[in-house]
């Protein structure tokens, strides 16, 4: 009986570990590709399923054949609208606009580590026109070797805010307090502790920012 329970415990542990690793191995910001309105700076608009690759650090879309492709000219894109959310093309980072003025953006990056060794596979990179999307073009993604080297274990959030005429960033309590003179840091440290602010929660941090700029 004890032996059976022992094997049962090992089996449950292995199943849980497999499920966890499967989830961790996703390299994308969203669990699934999202319907997106892609607005270019020259006024052109397209729709396509879009996601953000946290390892390769760029947005990807699916063409009509469900092939994942990178945007050919990402610098020409003004905004990506996913539902009621707006994203910008950052420098190797996904940037969500929560508020335009005063600025409050959330920057998403992947926390990665080396993947377990396994046989890599190859692929080719080529540029192709997506006719079904009325001119939306992309570059085919090379698969395998780069993806096999690292996996995403978590998603980091960095907050980019407008403070006066400057733009500053913070990601935890310590870096947030540095936005203020030392005399004010004690007060805001107490506020954070009393309200149990979780810097992983965009809603809580946004409310904290709004309170801080109103005083």
Whereabouts are the PLM-identified features?
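Exposed beta-strand and adjacent loop surfaces of beta-rich binding modules
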Residues: 16, 35, 58
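A short, solvent-exposed beta-edge/loop patch
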Residues: 145-200, 204-209, 214
């Amino acid at each position: 009986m004890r032996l059976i329970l022992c094997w049962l415990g090992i089996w449950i542990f292995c199943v849980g570990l497999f499920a966890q690793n499967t989830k961790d191995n996703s390299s994308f910001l969203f669990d699934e590709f999202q319907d997106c309105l892609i607005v270019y700076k020259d006024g052109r608009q397209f729709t396509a399923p879009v996601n953000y690759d946290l390892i390769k650090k760029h947005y990807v879309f699916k063409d009509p054949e469900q092939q994942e492709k990178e945007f050919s000219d990402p610098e020409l894109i003004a905004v990506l609208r996913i539902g009621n959310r707006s994203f910008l093309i950052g420098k190797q980072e996904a940037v969500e606009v929560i508020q335009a003025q005063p600025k409050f953006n959330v920057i998403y990056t992947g926390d990665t580590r080396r993947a377990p060794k396994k046989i890599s596979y190859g692929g080719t990179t080529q540029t192709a026109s997506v006719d079904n999307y009325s001119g939306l073009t992309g570059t085919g993604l090379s698969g395998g070797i780069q993806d096999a080297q690292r996996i995403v274990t978590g998603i980091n959030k960095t907050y980019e805010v407008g403070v006066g005429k400057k733009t500053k960033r913070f990601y935890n309590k310590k870096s947030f307090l540095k936005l203020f003179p030392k005399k004010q840091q004690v007060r805001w440290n107490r506020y954070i502790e009393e309200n149990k602010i979780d810097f992983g929660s965009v809603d809580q941090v946004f409310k904290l920012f709004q309170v801080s700029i109103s005083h």
